[in-house]
Amino acid sequence: MRKAINPPNAPSAIGTYNQGIETDGLVFTSGQVGIDPSTGQLVDGGIDMQAAQTLKNIEVILSSLDLGKESIVKLTVFVKNLDDFPFVNEAFKNFFNGIDYPARSTVEVSELPLGALIEIECIAIK
């Protein structure tokens, strides 16, 4: 059985999807971008600010299930420019801050929704 996850304090989905799905002890988030939930707009700044906000948005989705960032086992990161990889690494370092890093893949793409510079999908365990 699967359960849709759409917490009210996370950014609203910009398409026909749920923010996440919980099934059989696993949580899968849809791709998140650096939208500020209070404005519905991408945060100002570059890749570093968008990466930080994207990770916060994932944290909000997980916290709606009483899960923390330590439950994250895999992240798939999509960036518009692989030259931004060091900024993504720094955002991850700040976000995970002493917690073991999850597995991760990073892929360069030509475009992302809303002109975002980064999008992240998450798999977590309950």
Residue ranges and their predicted role:
Residues 2-126:
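Short, polar/acidic, helix-capping and beta-turn segments at strand->helix junctions
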